[in-house]
Amino acid sequence: MSVKWEKLEGNEGVLTVEVDAEKVNKGLDAAFKKVVKNITLPGFRKGKVPRVLFEKRFGVEALYQDALDILLPEAYAKAVEEAGIEPVSMPEIDIEQMEKGKSLIFKAKVTVKPEVKLGQYKGLEVEKMDTTVTDEDVENELKRLQEDYAELVVKEDGTVENGDTVVIDFEGFVDGEPFEGGKAENYSLEIGSGTFIPGFEEQLVGMKAGEEKEIQVTFPDEYHAKQLAGKPATFKVKVHEVKAKQLPALDDEFAKDVDEEVETLDELKAKIRARLEEAKKNEAETALRNAVVEKAAANAEMDIPEVMIKNETDRMLREFDQRLQMQGLNLQLYYQFSGQDEASLREQMKEDAEKRVRAALTLEAIAKAENIEVTDEEVNKELEKMAEAYKLSVDKLKELLGSLDGVKEDLKWRKTVDFLVEHSKVAA
């Protein structure tokens, strides 16, 4: 097999590949064995038609596409390896010659990884976040816990105030007609949560249990239900019940309710401080690592192919969909509620996708320049940590992973970022 690589403008190029005639004939043989299984001719059982008769009846050309399906993947993979290129797009294949008894010649136009010209990546000046935990931080966390443990208590004679929870019936009308999804009974709504259309919750303030009222609002222009977007609406509302949050006292009993391992409020505060300190330390470490990568990437020069940004956007979209599914949602529901569509979400993700690609290419170039590699021992240690976290045996984890390439790549990038941090100038 002969291979020729021709670089074109930008990051594109063309592979010209010639597969010898003997290999082509073997591909045709394999194609015939596959195709003949479904062929029936008078005088022959299904799948038993002789090759000569098949070619006389249908022509050898009838085998070409199946032969190409067999030959091309292997030939293309070998050509890529021989040419020493790293394609980032699917190839555009053009068959120049395919004939029995002759070699197969095809061209494959592909986009490859860009060349990266590294700038400064050692001695980068970065600031480390302040990890001090103040008394105010601890008090704010206590208030948050207090809110979490608050009880809703019915206000017998009180009026609706911001922060209260009301139980209501409502029915909405547009142009005098009810609309789908505009009616509910005994619906719990926290005033000030922003759950409803702008202006709805505010108009409930001051009402009492048992009162009825008509509320005038206008649907936002970007509302997910296009038939309602921008239209004025009237809601008939009845308040059944008004509830207010009753915060628990900040005392030792509260501390024991929050954390069974403590006996006093002071002990709870100490645990909160320790937890916040650990969180700030981790946050500072992450910010520092992100900063050195961002600076190194900004100093590097490269021409990123659009297809790499598209591929990364695809990956980000899949990750987002998976996170939504963990919350019982999906992309289609998200589009409905947010008023966005796939095109606008992709556009929103594009800048971050480009940053991710730039960072990955920069780290790859630095790892190559500094001969940063991952040892088998490091891979095994990482597998042991992962297996322990997932409560699996290492063998079972390997079976589930299939390939260890992802683990090796993650470790390599981690080591490369470690290198950048070690060789940076960190200001406190």
From Swiss-Prot:
It catalyses: [protein]-peptidylproline (omega=180) = [protein]-peptidylproline (omega=0). Keywords: Cell cycle, Cell division, Chaperone, Cytoplasm, Isomerase, Rotamase. PROSITE patterns: FKBP_PPIASE (PS50059). Belongs to the FKBP-type PPIase family. Tig subfamily. GO terms for cellular component: cytoplasm. This is Trigger factor. The keyword Transport does not apply. Its EC number is 5.2.1.8. The gene is tig. GO terms for biological process: 'de novo' cotranslational protein folding; cell division; chaperone-mediated protein folding; protein transport; protein unfolding. The lineage of its organism: Bacteria, Bacillati, Bacillota, Bacilli, Bacillales. InterPro entries: PPIase_dom_sf (IPR046357), PPIase_FKBP_dom (IPR001179), Trig_fac (IPR005215), Trigger_fac_C (IPR008880), Trigger_fac_C_sf (IPR037041), Trigger_fac_ribosome-bd_bac (IPR008881), Trigger_fac_ribosome-bd_sf (IPR036611), Trigger_fact/SurA_dom_sf (IPR027304). Involved in protein export. Acts as a chaperone by maintaining the newly synthesized protein in an open conformation. Functions as a peptidyl-prolyl cis-trans isomerase. GO terms for molecular function: peptidyl-prolyl cis-trans isomerase activity; protein folding chaperone; ribosome binding. Residues 163-248 form the PPIase FKBP-type domain. Consists of 3 domains; the N-terminus binds the ribosome, the middle domain has PPIase activity, while the C-terminus has intrinsic chaperone activity on its own. It is found in: Cytoplasm.
